[in-house]
Design a protein with these regions (language model features):
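Residue-level detector of anion-binding/catalytic polar loops
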Residues: 35, 104, 183
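N-terminal helical cap/lid subdomain that shapes the substrate entry/recognition surface
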Residues: 2-101, 117
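Asp-based, Mg2+/Mn2+-dependent phosphohydrolase catalytic module
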Residues: 1-4, 96, 112-214
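Conserved SAM-binding loop
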Residues: 14, 87, 105-108, 142, ...
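Helix N-cap/beta->alpha junction signal
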Residues: 17, 89, 109-112, 170
Length: 214
């Protein structure tokens, strides 16, 4: 085994949530007077913790988002998850293989613990992720692109950073893994390869990943 721990991003890597979330985010920001297209939401906010969305909107417009922004946004997202969320193609087979081969793994997401739980329950991925394998930006002081979340996950899992590999689909996540001095495999299903500069290796389907990890 090349690594002692596989650290997965969640949204867009394990659960196919990015199209849902960014469609809702773009529409809600536009509704609030901050015109945003789906493509702009993907470009600017994919992989971000909620506080970073607030910071970017205020930086660009000089206006604060409403105090209930997070609650309204998550309410809309969770309702959509219940209707249509699916695992990323190949995620179930990959997790089955890692579990069968006794490869240690966890998830480290910019999303809240509630968002992770809702997504995993809806897609059936919760069977592979007990609480000890789930880490959120809520657990640390700084979210991606800071290394804190990945370093926290490695520490909690008892693995040295240099023995970890991160699986990411966002530029922020790749930067965070680089800052943590971990190898990172960049998933290009949603993000152009050119935007994942710094990735140790790129792949386009989860079916390719098992062979890269051994």
């Amino acid at each position: 085994m090349r690594y002692d721990l596989v650290i997965f991003d969640n949204d867009g890597v394990l659960v196919d949530s990015e199209p849902i979330s960014n469609t809702i985010l773009a529409a809600y920001l536009t509704e609030l007077g901050h015109p945003t297209s789906y493509e702009e939401s993907i470009r600017d906010y994919m992989g971000s913790a909620m506080h970073r969305i607030h910071e970017l909107v205020q930086e660009r417009s000089g206006q604060r988002l409403p105090e209930d922004f997070d609650d309204v946004f998550h309410g809309r997202v969770f309702a959509a998850f219940e209707r249509e969320l699916q695992p990323v193609p190949g995620a179930v087979q990959l997790l089955e293989k890692l579990a069968a081969d006794e490869v240690p793994y966890c998830v480290a997401s910019s999303g809240s613990h509630e968002r992770i739980r809702v997504g995993h329950r809806k897609t059936g991925l919760d069977r592979w992720f007990d609480e000890g394998r789930v880490f959120s930006s809520q657990d640390v002081g700084r979210g991606k692109p800071a290394p804190d979340l990945f370093l926290h996950a490695a520490e909690r899992m008892g693995v040295a950073p240099e023995r970890c590999v991160v699986v990411e689909d966002s530029p922020l996540g790749v930067r965070a893994a680089n800052a943590a001095e971990m190898d990172v495999y960049g998933f290009t299903a949603m993000t152009p390869a050119a935007k994942l500069t710094g990735a140790t290796q790129l792949f386009s389907e989860l079916g390719e990943l098992a062979d890269l990890l051994v």
